[in-house]
Amino acid sequence: MAKQPHLLVEAGELADIALVPGDPGRVDRIPDHCENAETVAQNREYKLVNANYEGQELTICSTGIGSPSAAIALEELAAVGVETFLRVGTTGALQPEIEIGDTVVATGAAKDEGTTKRYEKSEVPAVPDYGVLSALVEAAEDRSAPVHVGPIATDDAFYAETDAYVEAWSEAGLLCVEMEAAALFTLA
């Protein structure tokens, strides 16, 4: 198999599990908590590092901002054998009890973006794998930091949200808004 055109990797070079932050700068910081970190590739917004965290081999791959670039990364990671994707990053809280530094574990994502419509009908919910979701909730609850579990929103217009739009999401019970989770859930 040839190298993937955007990630510049091929089968056998990556771990089965990938952390997928949007920001390449996070790919530089996450290995500070790991051992044996090694840069595998870097192209455009995509930076890939293999590392070991507490005995678990993993790959860290930035996706850039938004669902389109995340979908490219996820498609190419899956093509070379990555099986589990864990999104790590920032989000905008929609509920007053969520504070900076809290952990949010998404049980699903309202699809308010265009990428997922190319993969399935918009009526199909974007939900994570239940086994991965359960493991994340259990791990998050074992930490001393606050954790919030529930549905979120994925949007593709960072500066276009009006107060009314944000209020509607909040009243619907969505925990936060970000720009990649619906694509991750749909593609994974």
Q: What residue ranges belong to the model's regions?
A:
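Active-site beta-loop-alpha junctions enriched in small/polar residues
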Residues: 91, 157, 182
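Metabolite-binding pocket within alpha/beta catalytic cores that recognizes anionic/polar moieties
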Residues: 1-134
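A residue-level signal for conserved active-site and pocket-lining positions in enzyme catalytic cores
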Residues: 23, 152, 188
